[in-house]
Design a protein with these regions (language model features):
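Hydrophobic alpha-helical
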Residues: 94-110, 177, 191, 195-256
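Hydrophobic alpha-helical segments within soluble ligand-binding/sensing domains
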Residues: 77, 133-158, 171-172, 201-203, ...
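Structural recognition of the beta-strand scaffold that forms the well-ordered cores
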Residues: 36-38, 66-68, 93-95, 115-120, ...
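Flexible loop/hinge segments that line or gate small-molecule binding clefts
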Residues: 99-139, 150, 157, 163, ...
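Short, solvent-exposed amphipathic alpha-helices that sit
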Residues: 46-63, 140-144, 168-187, 201, ...
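Extracytoplasmic "Venus flytrap"
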Residues: 34-61, 65-83, 87-89, 95-99, ...
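Short, low-complexity disordered leader/linker segments with a strong preference
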Residues: 1-34, 107-114, 319
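Hinge/cleft segment of the Venus flytrap/periplasmic-binding protein
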Residues: 161-169, 180-181, 270-319
Length: 319
């Protein structure tokens, strides 16, 4: 009888162990840690690349990742943060809508013990982010400004189209550009207006400015979407070739336009580099590392007709 009981118990134990092992394995798959990727807008190809590159790197590192679109709306961004903090995410890779306003959301995450890593756009509130991975916009626009001066022969009338007035990048780019261009008396800025980094708004701004100032020789735009919008307005006005267009970002359509001789130059940012760096640092933080840099600058490179063959897909071809 004792032997019969033993024969019955052993298979039961084995079956239990197998069941436990299977459920534990399935449980571990279901409970994969999550990282949130919050992007200011997905209505711009550059930011789509930034967001998707971050998601892809998180998945490569073994996390589930969710992409959130703030639609350039601070209220939408705040709503995303509320949902993220209530849902148990381990980290947030963040492209803010506003340098000042977005700090409140990042600070709330920090208080909740959820680390925030900023990509491309800066937050002014101290202690809100673990690390901010940012393009060196100021230096990049110094380089672009020098090429602008050279291309213009040190003289001419130009327009500046700014991005979002609440974004530090807008002013860093403008200051870098003017730190060079303002040294040349022959170069005169006849208008400066913002178009919120939006292609359609930039087209409308350029149409209006050309009517008020028919003698424009160039336009400097704070990003490539606006540069393409300005070019569309110039083309529609029959002034293609008469007004030089300069952008900033390194978006594919602008790089292709440089190849075709439609755009003079842009500043190549590297969204993939920033996204991969942010995801890698978040992974290190989750695993216990705390000795991480507060800021990481990413160099910007000038792209023009002389070197455009080396660039594509939001970066260098050899990357």
């Amino acid at each position: 009888m004792k032997r019969i009981i033993q024969h019955l118990i052993i298979p039961v134990i084995l079956l239990y162990a197998m069941t436990c092992n299977t459920s534990c394995t399935n449980g571990s798959k279901e409970k994969k840690e999550r990282i949130a990727v919050v992007i200011s807008t997905l209505n711009n190809p550059w930011f789509v690349v930034l967001g998707q590159s971050a998601v892809d790197k998180c998945k490569e590192l073994g996390y589930d990742a969710t992409l959130f679109d703030s639609q350039n709306n601070p209220s939408k961004e705040a709503e995303h943060f509320d949902n993220i903090l209530a849902s148990g995410y381990k980290a947030i890779l963040f492209n803010p809508t506003d340098a000042d306003g977005s700090g409140v959301n990042a600070k709330a995450a920090a208080r909740a013990g959820v680390p925030v890593f900023c990509m491309d756009r800066e937050i002014n509130l101290p202690g809100a982010c673990v690390t901010q991975i940012l393009s060196d916009n100021y230096s990049g626009c110094i380089t672009l400004g020098k090429y602008f001066v050279e291309s213009m022969g040190k003289k001419g009338n130009y327009v500046e189209i700014l991005g979002l007035v609440g974004d530090n990048n807008t002013w860093a780019r403008s200051r870098g550009f003017h730190s060079v261009v303002d040294c040349y008396e022959g170069l005169k800025m006849v208008a400066q207006q913002n178009a919120d980094f939006d292609q359609n708004k930039a087209m409308e701004v350029m149409e209006s400015v050309m009517q008020a100032h028919p003698d424009i020789d160039a336009v400097f735009c704070g990003n490539d979407a606006m540069a393409m919008g300005a070019y569309q307005a110039i083309l529609a006005a029959g002034k293609d070739g008469d007004i030089k267009v300069f952008g900033f970002d390194g978006a594919n359509d602008c790089v292709n336009a440089i190849r075709e001789g439609k755009i003079e130059a842009t500043g190549m940012q590297f969204p993939k580099t920033m996204a991969i760096t942010a995801a890698t640092l978040a992974d290190k933080y989750i695993k216990g590392e705390r000795n991480l840099p507060k800021k990481l600058p990413v160099a910007v490179e000038l792209v023009n007709k002389e070197n455009v063959k080396n660039y594509g897909d939001f970066g260098r071809i050899d990357q």
